[in-house]
Amino acid sequence: MSNPELSSEKKASLVETLKNKLQALAEQHVDVLESLAPVVRKRVDVLIEIQSQHDELEAKFLEEKSALEAKYHKLYGPLYSKRSEIVSGVLEVEGETEEREEKGVPDFWLKAMKNNEILAEEIHESDEEALKYLKDIKWCRIDDLKGFKFEFFFDTNPFFKNQVLTKTYHMIDEDDEPILEKAIGTEIEWHPGNCLTQEVLTKESLESTKPITKTEEYESFFNFFSPPQVPEDDAKIDENTVEELQNQMERDYDIASTLRDKIIPHAVSWFTGEAVQDEDYGASWVDDEEDDDDEYSDEEA
């Protein structure tokens, strides 16, 4: 399994770096307070106390929200199961009597995901044939409701042996906010010659009897199951590497959030394209609001 979890040494190093940054921010915070006039400082102190009370309420809200989401996720379960049976052709809808060779709803999940802008960028033409065998996607909470896990169910196919591909996100609490600790994906057992994520190229060597092999990496949706990894060599973790790794992990989490919060609960709307229209309308409404604000500002000026 691919695992971006940091070693204890790297964790300690990163924690120390974060502590230093937090210390610098704290010192900056103190400088701001000390620069205030005494009477203003008293008012700000009261505002800080109000904010503290707000944060306590917000923490309770997030706790209750998480429990409520878990409750309704269980209630959604039977609906998702029935949807899966119809999509895969296990269950026929009432009133359908005509015998047909085609079962279920072909390419349901492939089309649903391709209609989403974020996921469409991850799905390449070479992925599509394999994703036609995808018959269901599920997710569930883990780690006391903090983390979550995906399960991708596939029919028997010529690409890989796995019937189920999983991706697990382990989260930790950081100032009452869930922070990604690590992500673990299934190691895909590709059938020979059908790997979509990489290819081993071989050519003869002029200097040796042994052939030269080179692994060519390919862009693929199935790289989702191989989360970004931290280099083993600490010397390679420079500022650019850290920034690139952070961008990769943020992108990976965006994909996961899209699957969890949009695609799975509203799959048929993404399949038909209705969800795309709703998102486009929402984006258009925001743009219109911003344009109105700009016009208002110009008139004032």
Curated annotation (Swiss-Prot):
GO terms for molecular function: histone binding. Residues 279-301 are annotated as: Disordered. The modification Phosphoserine is found at S297. Keywords: Chaperone, Coiled coil, Cytoplasm, Nucleus, Phosphoprotein. One of its GO terms (biological process) is double-strand break repair via homologous recombination. A motif (Nuclear export signal) lies at residues 36-51. InterPro entries: NAP-like_sf (IPR037231), NAP_family (IPR002164). GO terms for cellular component: cytoplasm; nucleus. Residues 15-69 form a coiled coil. It is found in: Nucleus; Cytoplasm. Signal peptide: none annotated. The acidic domain is probably involved in the interaction with histones. Belongs to the nucleosome assembly protein (NAP) family. May modulate chromatin structure by regulation of nucleosome assembly/disassembly. This is Nucleosome assembly protein 1;3. It comes from Oryza sativa subsp. indica.
